[in-house]
Amino acid sequence: MERIKELRDLMSQSRTREILTKTTVDHMAIIKKYTSGRQEKNPALRMKWMMAMKYPITADKRIIEMIPERNEQGQTLWSKTNDAGSDRVMVSPLAVTWWNRNGPTTSAVYYPKVYKTYFEKVERLKHGTFGPVHFRNQIKIRRRVDINPGHADLNAKEAQDVIMEVVFPNEVGARILTSESQLTITKEKKEELQDCKIAPLMVAYMLERELVRKTRFLPVAGGTSSVYIEVLHLTQGTCWEQMYTPGGEVRNDDVIQSMIIAARNIVRRATVSADPLASLLEMCHSTQIGGIRMVDILRQNPTEEQAVDICKAAMGLRISSSFSFGGFTFKRTSGTSVKKEEEVLTGNLQTLKIRVHEGYEEFTMVGRRATAILRKATRRLIQLIVSGRDEQSIAEAIIVAMVFSQEDCMIKAVRGDLNFVNRANQRLNPMHQLLRHFQKDAKVLFQNWGIEPIDNVMGMIGILPDMTPSTEMSLRGVRVSKMGVDEYSSTERVVVSIDRFLRVRDQRGNVLLSPEEVSETQGTEKLAITYSSSMMWEINGPESVLVNTYQWIIRNWETVKIQWSQDPTMLYNKMEFEPFQSLVPKAARGQYSGFVRTLFQQMRDVLGTFDTVQIIKLLPFAAAPPEQSRMQFSSLTVNVRGSGMRILVRGNSPVFNYNKATKRLTVLGKDAGALTEDPDEGTAGVESAVLRGFLILGKEDKRYGPALSINELSNLAKGEKANVLIGQGDVVLVMKRKRDSSILTDSQTATKRIRMAIN
């Protein structure tokens, strides 16, 4: 009522009436703008106006018990009036000050734990170094980048389950924590945050930052790893850049970097094996990066890189639909084409069979150091707009586009024969033959391409055959632009198929990736990569192959020993002996193998000459296809440390040294493990392999309990029967002999009996 009276008084003054009647507020759009919807239209003004009131804040009723009515200065902190339309009370900003100074405190120990990502960011900035500011045109291109450093790689659903389990363990709702990383993180965080008083919602938000990769599509001119992205606003503007070195690395960037290196190594190695796809899968499944299984990382990490995508395709994961050629990612933005096989003649009159794309198409090409827009028709480049960091990068992009265009003048520019091969010594396909040829030398290509006069277009200049800029002339159809071409922003993934030679195709049969596209760049990984597969032993050179081969034999000696006596051929064919062959001089491989196999056969035939150490030492040499010759050797040569080193057939050498006292083997001075059994027990090895002192009674008999291992047999009493596990997981029933005299005949009969019992 009082307000209405006040208004009446105001209206009685002529000035008020004049203002309200003469000032036009009849613009409907403006009235609508400020009066419709819940969205605040002028937040700054609203804030100022609200804060000018005495009690601009509302709080829960419980606050009255927790805060005095007045502070030390006698100022009122809260009002007895309720907030209109809710059961909250009105509070003065001074109450916040009082609460901050005198309110309850919690232990500070949890802050660095909950706000971990912020504390770490401060550390990185503190130790980072900012260099000089340079003013120059920035060629920024939008790329999908990771914006929160230091996160684990869970997807949103996995993270949600972890957060619920950590922050709200008693809430109802099914939560399935399956992956190794989920379980580890949950356990870690529960321990860390016991008795934490920070608001659960805050903890949940902060956990989300720590667990989930967040990506944005941002214009970037420099480094794209998350520790650079977090300071993007400090390091690059429209016309300036500031040099910056991060003051620390974060695991998520290291994971990506190490994963790319591992994937490249694995693809390169798989290419040269007999069955590339099977080998690649075996290696991916047996490799760990920073202690986490590589396949788990591949499943969770959205990074796109040629080798990484080949590994993903092999695992049946979806990958991006763009394709790769010459190290550039191509994305078709319009047009269509059909593919036809065509035969073309090079400048050297060599015939090439190429798959020609017939039809008009437009592509974006994105590389690490250059980007381009390409418009082409059937075997004709219509236009190429390229931008890059330097002359060299621009030239790379131009070569790739010219080859991709399949123009006749490009094919005619070939001088000499095309016979490039891949790592497995197979000829490359014609398109990659052409690419390699011009990447080596593009002079003739650029000279023969032709030049044209150009119009003056803003932001574009011409480029001459010698790669110098020009404003008058340019290579036909080619222009250099100041603006970069954005990376393809979509995160869409498609189903692909992969053949045994690691060529990845989309569902229409277009090749998206092949091993030729995998970069040869070598880097040093930030996180430890552990390749358990024998195929990767050679990655660290010949010494590693030697040590790993002998370590493998010793670790698996129980099984190896049984195979040695019963099924040597199968043993010789084991892939673990493959890398070793590259150390044996080519000319000697067959002879060594024949010699060692004969020696082994004599050991099997004549009992008592068995020598564990000698078998271990010579075994890898027997894996090569043998040559029948009467050659005898007292030492065998292996190529390590840049020269041939000798392994003595009888006795120790620097390469292979067995210490009887410690029962340990050192290979080239590196420890290769210990032998569990005593090699000096005369004929121990082989006869324990064929069960010395036991009579083989026949097939497994369940009444005698579970199968024992060879080692457990020694506990049997004389005459006692047991099932025993031998060789390839076969089980036979044996009885411990009552007398020792008949031991010698066991070896001969055992082999026959085992075969009979199994078959």
UniProtKB/Swiss-Prot annotation:
Cellular component GO terms, alphabetical: host cell nucleus; virion component
Main location per the UniProt record: virion
Site (Avian adaptation): E627
Ranges spanned by the short sequence motif Nuclear localization signal, renumbered to the chain: 736-739
One annotated GO molecular function: RNA binding
Keywords, in A-Z order: Cap snatching, Eukaryotic host gene expression shutoff by virus, Eukaryotic host transcription shutoff by virus, Host gene expression shutoff by virus, Host nucleus, Host-virus interaction, Inhibition of host RNA polymerase II by virus, mRNA capping, mRNA processing, Viral transcription, Virion
Protein location: Virion; Host nucleus
BP GO terms, sorted: 7-methylguanosine mRNA capping; cap snatching; DNA-templated transcription; symbiont-mediated suppression of host gene expression; symbiont-mediated suppression of host mRNA transcription via inhibition of RNA polymerase II activity; viral RNA genome replication
One Pfam assignment: Flu_PB2_4th
Assembly and interaction partners: Influenza RNA polymerase is composed of three subunits: PB1, PB2 and PA. Interacts (via N-terminus) with PB1 (via C-terminus). Interacts with nucleoprotein NP (via N-terminus).
Annotated function: Plays an essential role in transcription initiation and cap-stealing mechanism, in which cellular capped pre-mRNAs are used to generate primers for viral transcription. Recognizes and binds the 7-methylguanosine-containing cap of the target pre-RNA which is subsequently cleaved after 10-13 nucleotides by the viral protein PA. Plays a role in the initiation of the viral genome replication and modulates the activity of the ribonucleoprotein (RNP) complex.
Family designation: Belongs to the influenza viruses PB2 family.
Name of the protein this chain belongs to: Polymerase basic protein 2
Organism: Influenza A virus (strain A/Duck/Hong Kong/2986.1/2000 H5N1 genotype C)
